[in-house]
């Protein structure tokens, strides 16, 4: 018999301890992984609701199960808010993740073996943009494009490759690129060769929703995103379009269900609906502008301390610190900073001589620290501590000093105040 007072703490102390330890880790560590963020208690409330019990294969008004009248309301709210947020005429909120959303786009628009032009993973792309270890690289003929010596996307080279190889689809978007993407130029290139333009805006969706980064929705045939990262919602994916093409919309819906998924996660879709409502509030724009301001402040200190930033700066929420030429790998930097309660991720950089398991760079992002309330002063102070460790990564005394400073700063800015 189920009772409302059932709890994990009494029933499963091993699991409860792991959850408690992770909660403490989040409170006592500074989170700088560019793809991570803190979602709101309202989103977590939705995810912990009885919506998790409901199976709802299909779409609102066209379900394969009965009893869906209220989950239809939930999903419709999420769809309409997503469309409003990004200026779309179509939204699918069912993908379980960004990768699932991307997979659905491939399924809807392509056949195995078709040619795709996507950003090289080593230059800032994503696994699902054509990496040979991913479904995208295994099932499709991938032509990679990249960045030039200045660290910017080389659109002339992109156009040359597009004309030469005539891909059926071009992919815009990234996982480690700190510049502004010219979506209009990409659409011009796509139109020149009759290709689809598909944009994966997962990393910058929150910035786009707030108007502090260019919106690809008016330019692309299809746009996908995660709903976490800068958007600060639950872990999940969405597909958007403003193409006003009902046949395209039907293909996308069919590629999600039944093509790639069965029942949607209604409790997560409720969390998405809440997050989209939060993203429509004026304070969300203030938050996203601060995310960019903090990233620029961090870059300023890195450059002052003699560190190289790929592309020389940032126009979004992230930066890539290039450690080539230094006696320090990305893996070592990641570990040293982690010992001081600063969480980053090792990351390959352009022309990286080291393997993806070691790398010569670290990727740093500001969404989570900004969510805690950090502003430019804290961002600069933190970057100074990071440089202290990178300058002397094998010195336990430096790591312990910085760890103490980090703990004090975290105590001033709790994740959930």
Curated annotation (Swiss-Prot):
Alphabetical keyword list: Amino-acid biosynthesis, Cytoplasm, One-carbon metabolism, Pyridoxal phosphate, Transferase
Positions with a binding annotation for (6S)-5,6,7,8-tetrahydrofolate: 121, 125-127, 355-357
What does the record give as its pathway? Answer: One-carbon metabolism; tetrahydrofolate interconversion; Amino-acid biosynthesis; glycine biosynthesis; glycine from L-serine: step 1/1
Gene Ontology biological-process entries? glycine biosynthetic process from serine; tetrahydrofolate interconversion; tetrahydrofolate metabolic process
Cofactor(s) the protein needs: pyridoxal 5'-phosphate
Molecular function in Gene Ontology: glycine hydroxymethyltransferase activity; pyridoxal phosphate binding
Q: Please name the InterPro entries in this protein's record.
A: PyrdxlP-dep_Trfase, PyrdxlP-dep_Trfase_major, PyrdxlP-dep_Trfase_small, Ser_HO-MeTrfase, Ser_HO-MeTrfase-like, Ser_HO-MeTrfase_PLP_BS, SHMT-like_dom
Q: Which GO terms describe its cellular component?
A: cytoplasm; cytosol
Catalysed reaction, written as an equation = (6R)-5,10-methylene-5,6,7,8-tetrahydrofolate + glycine + H2O = (6S)-5,6,7,8-tetrahydrofolate + L-serine
Enumerate the Pfam families for this protein: SHMT (PF00464)
Instruction: Spell out which residues are annotated as carrying N6-(pyridoxal phosphate)lysine.
Output: 229
Give the highest taxon in the source lineage. Bacteria
For the site Plays an important role in substrate specificity, which positions are given? 228
> What residue stretch is flagged as signal peptide?
none
Keyword Transferase listed: yes
- Do you know which NCBIfam families this protein is assigned to? PRK00011.1
Described purpose of this protein according to its UniProt entry: Catalyzes the reversible interconversion of serine and glycine with tetrahydrofolate (THF) serving as the one-carbon carrier. This reaction serves as the major source of one-carbon groups required for the biosynthesis of purines, thymidylate, methionine, and other important biomolecules. Also exhibits THF-independent aldolase activity toward beta-hydroxyamino acids, producing glycine and aldehydes, via a retro-aldol mechanism.
Q: How does it assemble?
A: Homodimer.
HAMAP family given in the database record: SHMT
Instruction: Kindly provide the name given to this protein in its UniProt entry.
Output: Serine hydroxymethyltransferase
* Native species: Shewanella oneidensis (strain ATCC 700550 / JCM 31522 / CIP 106686 / LMG 19005 / NCIMB 14063 / MR-1)
């Amino acid at each position: 018999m189920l009772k409302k007072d059932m709890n994990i703490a009494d029933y499963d102390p091993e699991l409860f301890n792991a959850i408690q330890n992770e909660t403490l880790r989040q409170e006592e560590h500074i989170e700088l992984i560019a793809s991570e963020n803190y979602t709101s208690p309202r989103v977590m409330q939705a995810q912990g609701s009885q919506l998790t019990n409901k199976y709802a294969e299909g779409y609102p008004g066209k379900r394969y199960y009965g009893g869906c009248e209220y989950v239809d309301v939930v999903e419709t709210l999420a769809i309409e808010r997503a469309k409003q947020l990004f200026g779309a005429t179509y939204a699918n909120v069912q993908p379980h993740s960004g990768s699932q959303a991307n997979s659905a786009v491939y399924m809807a628009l392509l056949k195995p073996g078709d040619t795709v032009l996507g950003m090289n993973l080593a230059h800032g792309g994503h696994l699902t943009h054509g990496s040979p270890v991913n479904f995208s690289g295994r099932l499709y003929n991938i032509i990679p494009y990249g960045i030039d010596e200045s660290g910017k996307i080389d659109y002339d080279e992109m156009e040359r490759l597009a004309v030469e190889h005539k891909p059926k689809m071009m992919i815009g978007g990234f996982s480690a690129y700190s510049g502004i993407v010219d979506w209009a130029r990409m659409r011009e290139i796509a139109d020149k060769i009759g290709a689809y333009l598909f944009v994966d805006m997962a990393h910058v969706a929150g910035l786009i929703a707030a108007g502090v980064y260019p919106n690809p929705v008016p330019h692309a045939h299809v746009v996908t995103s995660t709903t976490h990262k800068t958007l600060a919602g639950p872990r999940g994916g969405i597909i958007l379009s403003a193409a006003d093409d009902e046949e395209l919309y039907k293909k996308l819906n069919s590629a999600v269900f039944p093509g790639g998924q069965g029942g949607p996660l209604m409790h997560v879709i409720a969390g998405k609906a809440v997050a989209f409502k939060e993203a429509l509030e004026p304070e969300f724009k203030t938050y996203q502008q601060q995310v960019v301001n903090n990233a620029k402040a961090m870059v300023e200190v890195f450059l002052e301390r003699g560190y190289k930033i790929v592309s020389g700066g940032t126009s979004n929420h992230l930066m890539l610190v290039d450690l080539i030429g230094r006696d320090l790998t990305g893996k070592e930097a990641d570990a040293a900073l982690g010992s001081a309660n600063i969480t980053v991720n090792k990351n390959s950089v352009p022309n990286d001589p080291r393997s993806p398991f070691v790398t010569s760079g670290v990727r740093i992002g500001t969404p989570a620290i900004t969510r805690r309330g950090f502003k430019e002063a804290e961002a600069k102070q933190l970057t100074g501590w990071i440089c202290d460790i990178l300058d002397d990564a094998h010195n336990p005394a430096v790591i312990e000093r910085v760890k103490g400073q980090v703990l004090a700063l975290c105590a001033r800015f709790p994740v959930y105040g």
